[in-house]
Amino acid sequence: YYNSLNTDLNEISKVGNGQTWDISSVSGGITTYTKYELPTKGNYGYLYPQATYFINEGGNSEVYYKSDDTGIKLLGAPSASFINPGIIEKGEIRPPIFEIKTPMNVGDQLNQTAYLVIDIPVSIIPDSLLNTLPIKPDSLRLKITTKYNYECTGSGILKCPGKDFSVLQQIANITTISNAEA
C-alpha cells in the first residue's frame, strides 16, 4: 500500500503542460459520489433563488452554487442557528466565490476574499447572554472571512482506475478567520 501511495503522490507533484498523472493503481473499498440537483429539490433552495444547483452533503447539509459561462460560484449553505438550533440561518458567501473559473490556463492565478455571513436576530438570543454585553445590539452577525489563492500549475491527463480525464492541476491556499459583529 505505501509503495503504491508514495508512487501516486510523486505522480501528482508534476507540473507544467502535457503531464500524465497516473493514479490508476490506487484502490480502496469505499465508493463515494456527489449528486448535483436542482435547487427546487433542496429543503432550503428558496434561500438561494439565483442558485442553479445544490449538493446535499448528508442530512440537512446543503451547499448551493451558481454555474454560468464564467465558472462555478459558491453561494452559501444554510446552517442551524448557533443560538437556537431549531432555526435555520441563511449562510451566504459575500461575494460568491469561484470554485471553478473558466477559462483557466497553466500559470493563471485567482485570488479572492469572501465572507460567509450569518445574520442572527437579536430576538432569539437569551437575555442572559445579551445582558453581559456592554451595549445592547439591535442585530448580531457571524462573519467568517476566507482568503482563497489558487494557481493553475499543470495540465494533462489524469489516469484513474477505469477512466482517464483531461484535467487542470491547481494549488490552493485557503485561510479562514471567524468573528462576531454587533
Task: Give residue spans per PLM region.
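Conserved functional acidic sites
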Residues: 1-182
